[in-house]
Amino acid sequence: MPTEFSFLGRRPTLLLLSLMTAATSSWAAPALTPAQAAANLTAPDLALPADETDSAPLSDGTVRTYAVPETGLVMVTPPVVSVTPAPVTPVVRETIQPEAAPVTPTAETPAAAALTTDPKTDELFINTYRAYQKKDAAAVTTGAETLATHPLAIYPELWNLLLQLSKSPQDAKQQQKMTTFISRHHGDYIAERARTDWARIAAEQNNAERFRTLYRRLDWNQTESDLVCSKARFDLADAVRTKKSLPAALTAAHRVLLETGKPDDGACVKLRSAYLAADPKAAWPVFLILMQQKRFNQARELATLTNAKQFPVNKNALSELLTNPTKWYKRHAKRLNREPAALLLVAALRLASSDTQTAAKIAESVSPRLSAARRSLLWSRVGLEAALNLDESASAYFARAGKMLGTAPDTVGKNFILTWNARAALRTGDWKKVLAAVNKLPPALKRSDAWIYWRARGLEKTGHPKKARQLFASISGHTEFYGLLACEALGKPYPNYQRPAPIPNASYWDKNPSVQRALAFYRLDLNAEGNREWNWALRKLKTDARLNLAAYAGSRDLFHREINTSEATPAVVFSQRYPRPHQTDIENAAQTAELDPAWVYGLIRQESRFVRQARSSVGAQGMMQVMPRTARWVAAHLALNDFSDEQLTDTSVNLTIGCRYLKLVADAFEGSMPLATAAYNAGPSRSAAWRAKLTRAEEGAVFAETIPFTETRNYVQRVLANTVHYASYYNSDKNVIKLSAILGTVTPKPIQNVALP
């Protein structure tokens, strides 16, 4: 099915949830909510506050697509974010005194206690957390009392308060207890957590006043999808009741419904119901939104419940179509011109993802009878699905949408559509078409490294070398994928910033409650929870303090925090961003498998950030995130007769099997690193299918940019850029690997079975 998958069936890297947004500009905030950032080991997870705006929040306030719940270990892939490094002057290594972190030490959470290990109380903490997730109030109450001296005692205390408040939301005593808790922990992340979950309880109880009071005080979580939907619902209810600002409230609600990545969330379902109650005539636009969001069951339910007068099509005919669109088309294919235009619009939207060619035939038939806006909406969707299927007709379909491509009323995914229009143009090899597509991008996307680079390439190919060089130069100081390619386009060396890492001020961070609570969570393998505390400590720090905290993370072997914390600065400290833990083991395994160690380092950095015990929700394990089934297959191939799944978290075993599998994948794709890297992430059969879709030999950079899975696209770009950095930064003979060389050219080859798991 041609869709941009967020879940990859073979071996997702810590549960892959992709963001349907393109790369942001060099130091714009990554497109992550704080919840997403917390749930992420590998992606840049913090907005960079400029040093002069010390209080900049982590979230940029935008409603995000596919927001992630704050519970559970998940992996989120944001856009590739490039860095404009600060000019570097050689400095002497010295201990840096960080600025005061925005945390409040409390008597209940002595920082040093975080490093104290007590297996019995740790086990009780985990069990209490599980009880909280199951809403077992009695077990949580008991756990909270017993864990009063645990380093993370404030969490069971909060869980207990939340369960009691959920049970009796109007109980004044429970409300006062929660208010007191929040006041006592003012300035700590736990207060943000308490306000967020209390706001959700208030929304569930339709307590608008309480919700707004809590929502206004949130620093991080205002952009969570359910809270955004609840706020829009309460604002709409006020407008309906007071008869004031109703058009504005309806417009805001429509925008939220259009942009939310969680239309199934209960809060967003309630908003949709409130919106339709306030404006029954909006039923048809909302129906079309649901069709584009592929919420076909919800669309069918809406059609069933809506007054027939609000739909421009017979509801029985609509039900027949939605129940079995393929059967419907076979019955009506020869008389499409006699079917109502609205019904054909729905038919094309319904079939676009599963049968794009048939959808295009229907769109062609009905186009003359549609308004310009509806015609644009339809062809935008057909073009998008064709582009995601790597169909060579995609660019022509997009062109049929006209000037309103991606922007017609009720069109879902404007930025996504416009970005894929540009990617479809890349696959045509028509550089004038590429330039035209890039020029249609919104300013923020146009300023991203990716589209600065491709615009420069287009200008270069169409006879404007001076303008092209100016654009290349504007990103050539960046250290990510397109910054490296821009350097090559200019014939200049890659950036080589040798700023030394600071000596960590351990005594300072040892007393920082948020940092120490994070360490306690990491000890319990509760990485998402630990990341929230870590990021909270980090959120207002300036560059030097962030680098010092990164050094502290490295000294604790928290390489995922060392990398991410250092990346949340404009100062490029290569030893922090590209560490080499387990050097002997990694290099031995790579060399035994006849792989370049730099590639293995680059892959592990993206897979697990060198977390030895990393485990995905579907079972991928260890630094190289190997699935047990794959591991058993490779072990049999290597005649490792004594292998067991439990060995996958053993560093040596994981590296041996992971490297051998990577070598087998590379050999299956004739040594092509883009194809092999994509295959390691998304599966060999998918990589082979993407290659088969090519109509001519394509440069590796174009192939990588047009991979239809957001996660895999970013993965390939990051892994290969990582490979260049590891090869360049640590290579004593300065024999620099060129990114363009390892990207190479990808040649089409008929689809074939790849005998690999």
Predicted segments with their positions:
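Gram-negative bacterial Sec-dependent N-terminal signal peptides
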Residues: 2-27
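Compositionally biased, proline/threonine/alanine/serine-rich low-complexity intrinsically disordered stretches
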Residues: 28-117, 121, 749-757
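Generic helix N-cap/helix-start motif at coil->alpha-helix transitions
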Residues: 116-124, 136, 149-157, 172-174, ...
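Residue-level signature for tetratricopeptide repeat
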Residues: 130, 159, 163, 201, ...
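Structural motif corresponding to the intra-repeat A-B loop/turn of tetratricopeptide repeats
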Residues: 134, 167, 201, 205, ...
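Alpha-helical repeat scaffolds
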Residues: 139-143, 171-184, 208-218, 242-258, ...
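Catalytic glycan-binding domains that act on GlcNAc-containing polysaccharides
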Residues: 150, 158, 361, 365-375, ...
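Alpha-helical adaptor scaffolds
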Residues: 161-166, 182-183, 195-204, 216, ...
